[in-house]
Amino acid sequence: MSQPAPEFAEELVPDSVIPHQTLPPLRYRDLPEAPHWRKLVGPSIILAGLALGSGEFVFWPYVTYKSGFVFFWACMLGVLTQFFMNLEIERWTLATGESAITGFCRLSRHWAWVMLIMNVVPWVWPGWATGASMLLSWTMFGADIKPLEASAPLTQMTVSIPAELQTQLRFDGSEKRLIWKGAQTPEQAVALKNLDAEPEFQQAVATITARVRRTGGLKHDAWYFQWIAIATLLLVGVVLTTSPVVYNTVEALQSYLVGLIFVIAITLGILIIKPYAVWAMLAGMWNIGGLPAADSGLEFMALLGALAFAGAGGTMNLGQSNFIRDKGYGMGKYIGRITSPLTGNEEPIADVGFHFHHTPENMRRWRDWWRAANIEHFFSFYLTCVVSLMLLALISYSLFRGPDGQLLPGMERFGGGMDFIWGEANLVQSQFSNPLVGNAFRSLFFVMGIALLFTTELGVLDAAARISADIIKINVLRENPQWTLARLYFVILWIEIILSIAILAAGALVPGFSSEPLNFLKISAAMNGMVMCIYGMLLLYLNLKIMPRSLAITPLRFVAMVWACAFFGYFSLQAIQLEVWPMLKSWFGG
């Protein structure tokens, strides 16, 4: 049996070990003994819950619906990349008890406000709240089906519109645009093309037909979904505010919901997934470098969203350091937890972290902690994400595509926004000859989707508030005893909720302002891809240059982090330039 490590007075850690730079020095304490990895399960389940609601349920089934498995290799690569990133985030917290962002702020005080902006702006878009509310509305009220307009520039209309097309086709002379409204049958597409042989008219028709094909010409809207979303945001706020120990509540809720999701997904998978879908997925995983066809209708932002949200994405990954600290990983045991000022006994929370003397005993404990953290994260995060991604993408492929890999007849009508989820639910229902059984499984699919999006909504609000409170307390209000970390957390939580409600209210009341969940998710994904590139570089420097050599990043993980920075940086810049900026300009009349 190993001997207990010797006790040390709470002395300051010298700069020769870990430079304190812009914050007070760390203090010495012994590294606690590491438990078995199964006792550490929790933080990575929360992180996986954050991933389930966007990448697993929305983006990758959407990409699969649009283009099959041609891009699925990037899905597997994205999850693996985030696995390595998350463990580098955990490394600093295990060794110091501080969040990774506090480590960044030791490098420069300016990183405090930069990280605060990067933690608030990408996550304020309420895509998960609107997504969950849309599914809940569909479950209760059905879809509000509306025709969509597709238009293209046309200088003049030189032929008359035949009677059979007049209800859907018109020419706007003032705007000089040819406009088609609603769905389009193959016969109508041929009739439209044969109207006029002029090249400009043919170009306009080709543009319109392509746009109708991408969306189906219909929008499956949801009744009252903005107001339902506001109610869910308020519900999450109340649940978190009244939790005696916030982390315990989040872990319990996420574990229950993730378990429920897995049971439903596996059940649906057994009943629905076709063998040809499995073979197509395996082929796609080895199709390294394959990209969706140009006519698939997939925007660059959707691809980036799928990559960023193959895991949790953005600063949510940084929230892993806050989760493991509250769970008591490593030196986080000495920090304290966030408790409710209303229902819990407020715990003292250390302003700065701790480190350990590098004695043989403490180094043995460090190796035990690092091994246990890696195993826990592999099973709780990596495998959870991979299995759920595969199941939900396979379900999408089996419902929408045939053995030849092509969309089944009529499936184009679900191409707009979140409509493909409405399509999935109704196709699930059609798999069963008994109407009662089919309706039950349709409802089960919606319940799974609501649970997936709600887990993400809960996790995003909690993690964003944790990270922001940590930044402000450590860097701005460290000497202010009135503003404890717990009080800051709850104030920021409700500010986030109010901002999200304001965006939803604008979507409900302001003409032209879109509340489409997929648009919100794309904006968040594009921003978070760039955020991951930036903090990836900071993690590299922190764990390579600031961390003591015996605890620092290894060569293999160094290569993985360099790859992650380049990967997310490239795709983010492209998405922002090509799609985010034009979308924002159109919203605000630019």
Name every feature range the model reports, one short phrase each.
Residues 95, 110-156, 202-217, 229-233, ...:
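Hydrophobic transmembrane alpha-helices that form the core helical bundles
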Residues 152-154, 221-231, 415-422, 472-509, ...:
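Loop-to-transmembrane helix boundary motifs in multi-pass membrane proteins
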Residues 215, 234-257, 268-275, 502-517, ...:
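Membrane-water interface regions at transmembrane-helix termini and the short interhelical loops
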Residues 20-25, 60-64, 86-112, 133-150, ...:
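Flexible loop linkers connecting adjacent transmembrane helices
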Residues 259-298, 303, 312-321, 536-549, ...:
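Hydrophobic alpha-helical segments and their helix-loop junctions in multi-pass secondary transporters
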Residues 47, 74-103, 114-130, 459:
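Juxtamembrane transmembrane-helix boundary signature
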